[in-house]
Amino acid sequence: MSLYNNDKKFRVAVCFSGQARHWQASAGNIKRFFNNDEYPHPELGIPVQTDYFIHTWDTNTWRYPKTGHDHSHNERHNDGAAIKEVYKPVTIEVENWIPEKFPRSWDSMFYSLAKSLLMKRNHELKNQFQYDIVVKARLDTIYNPAHRFPLFRIWPGIAYTSTAISKFPTEFNYNNFDDVLFYAQSPVMDLLGDLYSTYKYLHNADLVAVNDGSIDLQPDMY
């Protein structure tokens, strides 16, 4: 039986966020990677159900690989209906992109993550259950076709990633995983989604640099 549910299903929520970009080229690969529904859970032996939640933008930002982030251009698209048809998500929002609303480097990333996780949480509350695993993913990613998303047991209070892990050189070399993919139990992902509220507070206190998104905290704030 699932840890949080009484319907004898292991429930996975895949929360897509960020720009769609080359979503058409990656959709088949992504659905195969996450679709474990035809197999029982490897440890629990119960059916697996995977639901999608999508927050994305009506605009894609493009730049050449070796150019800086300040040398890019925006293109609007009308792919929302097609994305919905392919993924058949529980909830989808294609939001109007307003650059002035997100002046700093990570603003839109944290915002979109928070919105996708809020969709997931609203669905849980409405239907009185909780997902066993919640995944933060992107619409423009290609995964190794030899693998599928791992359904091993995960622990409370821990977030996992299968992508590159870097270090924060100015934060005691703590681990930092990127925005491609990470996952955790549902309450942990809700906490991570709330990073946007904290980041927004720091913005309003003029503690986040506009150009590079770095945070400048005074000693008395620790």
PLM regions: where:
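Short acidic, S/G/P-rich loop/turn micro-motifs used as interaction or catalytic elements
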Residues: 19-23, 60-61, 141-144, 188
